[in-house]
Amino acid sequence: DGSSWHDLFLSIEGPAVTRLARFFDGLRRWIASERPTLRMLLHIFSRRSDKSGSLRWLFNGPFSRLSPLTRTLRQDIAAASRLDMIQAYFSPNWGTLRRLANVEKRGGEMRLISAARSDNMTTIFAARHCYRRLLRNRIRIFEYVPQMLHMKLIVAGDAVYIGSANFDMRSLYINGEIMIRVDDA
């Protein structure tokens, strides 16, 4: 009946798991502290985001500047000659839409798979509102029909992002999100 969700799962082993556990330990200590502040929380997000490496954890929160996730993703999009995205919720700001369109303008290729069904139809309308600008720039857009889409996957050149962040304003600039970035995928 199409009421189930389609998602993506992965299994991670080794030192990357230890790094993620340290992030969650920091969150647990923040929650248990007598006076948790937003500044303390953002310090955890920033400090635990990996600055380099072929497998990097990138965390996001309500930063006044670009978060490690948003900054790294912008850099990868700017350098990508090929960009593929599967997004449950897709409603970036106009500046980000322009960056996506620039992939095609540079002679690259971009494809987007977005949700055709949702438990919140405003997210579908928001995504469709963004399509016109992308279609004018020859970006190929597909909507996933069989089930509700919950997947968040970005392939920008040789970098792959998988995690909790949708490609919308809340996920990129406000929500606490976790993405793993894998190089040379």
Briefly describe each language-model feature range.
Residues 1-185:
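Charged, low-complexity intrinsically disordered terminal segments
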